[in-house]
Design a protein with these regions (language model features):
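An N-terminal amphipathic alpha-helical segment
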Residues: 46-74
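Acidic, serine/threonine-rich, charge-biased low-complexity segments
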Residues: 1-7, 48-52, 71, 139, ...
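Amphipathic, interaction-prone secondary-structure segments
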Residues: 76-119
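Intrinsic-disorder-associated interaction segments
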Residues: 29, 33, 37, 54, ...
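Exposed alpha-helical structural elements
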Residues: 35, 39-42, 60, 64-67, ...
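Long, intrinsically disordered low-complexity tandem-repeat segments
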Residues: 6-24
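A recognition module on extended beta-rich or small alphabeta surfaces enriched in W/G with H and D/E
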Residues: 114-150
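N-terminal intrinsically disordered, low-complexity segments enriched in P/E/S/T
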Residues: 3, 21-54
Length: 150
């Protein structure tokens, strides 16, 4: 009989959590979600009238978010001019992942991630910045996060 081992993502040990930069985080607290949830709500409120009804926190709604970011990029504004918009749209994508998978927001030193139940960390705010640079997709990030560990 062989002994089953678990990898790091299967552990529920609260003392051995590190973020993507290698720093140890405290166990998640509900307050870690406060800012991203607010940023997501602000992004939905600021969305064009034709788009707002479609931002229903469903995975398909992220297609529209990707298109919004693509349109921003085509307009050519400097990053600093759209940084808060991108933060809000990334937070919206994170909220979609949270609602679809039962994930939790994690935060440390001003950075925010989503931790899915399988233990993986996702960076939707960074993915929104990559989308603006032409190298990412919030829709695909959500697809990968909701598929679970393979």
């Amino acid at each position: 009989m062989t002994r089953r081992t678990t990898d790091q993502t299967d552990r529920t040990d609260q003392t051995d959590r590190t973020n993507p930069t290698g720093r140890t985080d405290q166990p998640p607290r509900p307050s870690a979600a406060a800012k991203p949830v607010r940023w997501a709500a602000e992004a939905v409120a600021a969305a064009p009238d034709a788009v707002r009804p479609h931002l229903d926190h469903s995975a398909p709604s992220l297609w529209r978010v990707d298109r919004m970011i693509e349109e921003l990029r085509r307009e050519g504004p400097p990053y600093n001019a759209v940084a808060n918009v991108l933060r809000g749209l990334g937070s919206y994508a994170g909220e979609v992942i949270v609602r679809q998978t039962g994930a939790e927001w994690w935060g440390s030193a001003g950075d925010h991630w989503v931790r899915t139940p399988d233990g993986r960390l996702w960076e939707p705010l960074d993915e929104a910045r990559r989308c603006f640079g032409g190298h990412g997709s919030l829709r695909l990030l959500c697809r990968d996060a909701t598929r679970g560990k393979r």
